[in-house]
Amino acid sequence: GDLVEFGNTAKVLGDPDHPYTRSLISAVPRSDVKLDRFPLVSYIEEAHEMEPLDVKNHWLGQSQDHRDYTGSLLTVENVNLRFTTKDSLFESRREYVQASNNVSFEVFEGETFGLVGESGSGKSTIARVIAGLYQPNSGKVTFEGIDLTSLKSEKERRPLRRQMQMVFQNPYTSMNPRMKIFDIIAEPIRFHKLTRNENETRQIVHDLLDHVGLGKMAGVKYPHEFSGGQRQRISIARALATRPRLLICDEPTSALDVSVQAQILNLLKDLQDELNLTMLFISHDLPVIRQMCDRIGVMQMGTLLEVSPTEQLFTAPQHEYSKQLISLMPEFKGMSQEGLKLA
């Protein structure tokens, strides 16, 4: 509740006096260079790292029954999806919006593939198609060589659904407010029958809570008792509970301030390194995308315009729309004696 600093905008952002202000500014994602980790903001209660686990000998690190498939882990091929905006008995009178237009890309095991674009570009729609929440009008989604769009029964889909989990933009709306955190995380474990007994489930949930930096005592609380950043940690713990191979992160930090965002993004980086996770990372925030992704796809109005390695996209974009996006990106170069540098 204390006002630690105030003054001219250029002075406060370019040459701050208070350590907290400096720390807060350092947490803003860099757009000019890629860093291994995001600087954390000190002076706040949530600024801590996750508890380390020996994942090689831990349940989280145990491999699932993977098929012998050497191609890309995920392939999206010519996916089209349209939504009806005006229905009618007559086809000629129906109106549609094209949410996805012949979208195709591959995601390789262990990489982070980013989808970026303005609001309404169709990037979240593609994520939901991959997760099986939407059925495309045409095209297919292949996971380890299996066409997910051809699977009709729940019995066929369940083993593959376990290997793909989503982290949503708003963690609070993805949780049952009447359930305790322990049961929220344990729910997918019980649903997929991944443990032999409840004692084993309890140990796994406690380990997951420790691993995302909350501690096992968080399990006895309800979602409303946590901050936005803490709830996102809970969402990540729940997503990890099935030991997925693919983590779909749909704007996971867009509702968080930069201090908490840095913690969550570092957590995702650590989890990917330790568990060899493959990630599909969706965001409209170009600096965040640059820091997180190995390759990036640019979407506009349901169409995938370009797929490039991260550094190539930011230094030599190919499509005119990509060039426009990069040119409009605010470039905050941080603290200097000359003051704020915004391009």
Spans of model-derived segments:
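Conserved catalytic motifs of ABC-family nucleotide-binding domains
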Residues: 243
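Helix-to-loop junction immediately C-terminal to a conserved catalytic motif
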Residues: 131
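Conserved ABC ATPase "signature" region
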Residues: 147, 199-217, 326-327
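Short catalytic/signature loops enriched in Gly
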Residues: 9-75, 86-91, 310-343
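Conserved ABC transporter NBD signature motif
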Residues: 139-147, 160
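A short, surface-exposed alpha-helical micro-motif characterized by mixed small hydrophobic
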Residues: 289-291
